[in-house]
Amino acid sequence: MTENSAVEVDEGVFESTAVIDNGSFGTRTIRFETGRLAQQAAGAVVAYLDDETMLLSATSASKHPKEHFDFFPLTVDVEERMYAAGRIPGSFFRREGRPSTDAILTCRLIDRPLRPSFVDGLRNEIQVVVTVMSLNPQDLYDVVAINAASASTQIAGLPFSGPVGGVRVALITSDENKAGQWVAFPTVEQLENAVFDMVVAGRIVSGSGDDADVAIMMVEAEATDNVISLIDGGAQAPTETIVAEGLEAAKPFIARLCTAQQQLAVKAAKPTGDFPVFPAYQDDVFAAVEAAAAEKLSAALTIAGKQERDDKTDEVKVEVLEQVAPNFEGREKELGAAFRSLTKKLVRQRILRDQFRIDGRGITDIRSLSAEVAIVPRAHGSALFERGETQILGVTTLDMVKMAQQVDSLGPETTKRYMHHYNFPPYSTGETGRVGSPKRREIGHGALAERALMPVLPSVEEFPYAIRQVSEALSSNGSTSMGSVCASTLALLNAGVPLKAPVAGIAMGLVSDQVDGETRYVALTDILGAEDAFGDMDFKVAGTKDFVTALQLDTKLDGIPSKVLAGALSQAKDARATILEVMAEAIDTPDEMSPFAPRVTAIKVPVDKIGEVIGPKGKMINSITEQTGANISIEDDGTVFVGATDGPSAQAAIDMINAIANPQLPKVGERFLGTVVKTTAFGAFVSLLPGRDGLVHISKLGSGKRIAKVEDVVSVGSKLRVEIADIDNRGKISLIPVEEDGAAAPAEQSEEAAAEK
């Protein structure tokens, strides 16, 4: 990495630059500029990635605090402008409307590391608005947005302990380097060869330059959709050890980005304003509450059941507050906050000193597990997963591929065949509240569960269905998102979806403090809701028995030792294995598809026959639909998806389509003298008839011997005598070579002779 710089490029306009060196993968340049745009905002920074991707971040603050608030009113908004990609919005009014899922998830990525960086007790409203103004289609803007938001906040004169640096690192493999290299700010094209991809945010806690000590604050990570095929090709699997290495690899990049922001702040930051802070309570209030409640509350916190424990804790709270309230008139809110702080202190003390938790478990114990499938009668697939008092219902729905979600955002994804929706109704925690459209938290949890399962889903060729997975959090006491991963795996298998491997998830926690003069860290397996709230880290890990598929980390600490993090990952792997065993007892292979699910078959027709299948004004395809009752969807490449409620209806539609588009279907056993038209790593495509090709797999080309490359035996243009070994229900033809002198009559048919028929 080269040195950063901060210069005045015009009167009052300053910029700084961070150059990220990825070795053989090239360099990426992040440039921060302030003083030109949005000058009335408290802080405004334009961030560029290689001068083509451009984001404006503006930070504003209210002049007066909201004294009646008992929380920090920070709002983060991401505005995707379609002009950034040279497009007009597809909505009816042709302008941007509600934020896309990508924008909402980016808001969460920004909020999570920024919020803990503000001083405790701040009650002024702070708003950060990031506008995507230009986007190279090969770039992902979310990590650029993290840096832009941090930079604009850093110069806004706020009590902010930044800057925060954010980087996406991907483990990209190649034929020469199967172990892979961690590449910062990878392009969309480079991610196709990545086995793991993570967004990491952090800040410098000591030192400077690339060797600065960086504290990781937030991680959002996932295995890529291609991970299993890449592993099969010899690539490194993203195990817990590899993930830990990736976090370390991200730190120098974060240091570089933070340094660039610091240098910009030196030139352009406003002096920190006088912002009043409102501590949750004063020391005298805490001392009084502790003296009155410590003994009774300690006893209440040993009750294992959540409901009974909460009831007893509430009883103690009412009793104690009545006892001490006369001494603190007008400070009732402080009393409640002090009681909560005392609860946190006692919970943490028991974990650190006794290695026991509030429900009586040891630090590595998992709550009781239960898994059951086929819960909802007419659903295509359903399952109920329970872990202690957390209960998740997973429901799977299958439909035609044309029902895939159309995505109108700035991201590279235009359709989603697999959709995961997570619902968290208020009754799941025994409370009342608003129900309706999903909140940001629900969207984020659904996206995490979706990413955990994407690597193991079958391709559209293997399973030609659109899949909607819904996770209903019926009862919550810790990590409903990871419970959703488990319930979804069970429901998908119950629906007959051929997953490449089952996936389970577990939530980890961390508690640390000074004990006997040393910093002691205790990692907790399967955390409760209270342990999440009172702990120092929320660490969710999902994966198969062999590798990690998704990971999410948020920490309140200024850095977690690598050894502690590695230990937590190891604990998570052990817990995942235990959960997978319980899930396998409920279902371990795909069930038969539900009679209520549509039967979808994919067949192939020549592209020049698509018009004939559709017919003038859709007459032919409508006729087939009316006669058979099947739904038919035709793709531009000639793939036809036929869906029906029963097999005979689908087959009738397929026969009618083939009668139009494939009138001369070859049969198994026929032989041809064909021409090799394409070679790939797995075989050679041979033209048999006009518009009709078949595949000779590489394993069939060596006359019984193993060959390294297809081109060692045949090349494009070669004549090859072949026999049809199989034709699948999609019309794909599998071929085997045959000897010249053993050819039967059909083998005398050359491609040219067949064309004359």
From Swiss-Prot:
Function, in words: Involved in mRNA degradation. Catalyzes the phosphorolysis of single-stranded polyribonucleotides processively in the 3'- to 5'-direction.
Single Gene Ontology BP annotation: mRNA catabolic process
Broad enzyme group: transferase
Species assigned in the record: Rhodococcus opacus (strain B4)
A single Gene Ontology CC term: cytosol
Span of domain KH: 598-657
Subcellular location per the Swiss-Prot or TrEMBL entry: Cytoplasm
Reaction(s) catalysed by this chain's protein: RNA(n+1) + phosphate = RNA(n) + a ribonucleoside 5'-diphosphate
Gene3D superfamilies hit by this protein: GHMP Kinase, N-terminal domain, K Homology domain, type 1, Nucleic acid-binding proteins
Name this protein carries in UniProt: Polyribonucleotide nucleotidyltransferase
Gene name in the database record: pnp
Domain S1 motif: 669-738
Similarity annotation: Belongs to the polyribonucleotide nucleotidyltransferase family.
Keyword annotations of the record: Cytoplasm, Magnesium, Metal-binding, Nucleotidyltransferase, RNA-binding, Transferase
Domain of life: Bacteria
E.C. no: 2.7.7.8
Record GO terms (molecular function): 3'-5'-RNA exonuclease activity; magnesium ion binding; polyribonucleotide nucleotidyltransferase activity; RNA binding
Pfam families in UniProt: KH_1, PNPase, RNase_PH, S1
Binding site for Mg(2+): D532, D538
CDD domains: KH-I_PNPase, RNase_PH_PNPase_2, S1_PNPase
Essential cofactor(s): Mg(2+)
